[in-house]
């Protein structure tokens, strides 16, 4: 799978789907929701989660998931009201 969407930038609409040659993903996963070095960023994890929910609404993703971060799970529990998700750590 091509490395697209990693970091704090966004891929243009359609770029990922074209690169992986699929119409949708079964699972969109945030494995480790932070960088390995400190980079100033105003990106809020809630914005990231809402973007993932938008992908579910658009039919591009069936499920979302978080792994290895109990703090992110707390945020997802608070803000995720409509979509099932899985957290494993």
Swiss-Prot record:
Cited SUPFAM superfamilies: NAD(P)-linked oxidoreductase
Domain of life, source organism: Eukaryota
Concerning Pfam families, the annotation shows: Aldo_ket_red
Q: Which UniProt keywords apply?
A: Eye lens protein
Q: What sections of the sequence does the record tag as coiled-coil? A: none
Q: Which molecular function terms from Gene Ontology are attached?
A: oxidoreductase activity; structural constituent of eye lens
Binding-site positions, substrate = 31
**Subunit annotation:** Monomer.
What protein family is recorded?
Belongs to the aldo/keto reductase family.
Its recorded name reads Rho beta-crystallin
Q: Which organism is it from?
A: Lepidodactylus lugubris
Q: Provide the taxonomic classification.
A: Eukaryota, Metazoa, Chordata, Craniata, Vertebrata
């Amino acid at each position: 799978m091509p490395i697209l969407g990693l970091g704090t930038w966004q891929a243009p609409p359609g770029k990922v789907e074209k690169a992986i040659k699929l119409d949708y993903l079964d699972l969109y996963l945030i494995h480790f929701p932070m960088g390995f070095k400190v980079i100033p960023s105003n990106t809020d994890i809630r914005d990231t989660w809402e973007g993932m929910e938008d992908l579910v609404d658009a039919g591009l993703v069936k499920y979302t998931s978080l792994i290895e971060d109990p703090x992110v799970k707390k945020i997802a529990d608070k803000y995720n009201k409509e979509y099932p998700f899985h957290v494993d750590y």
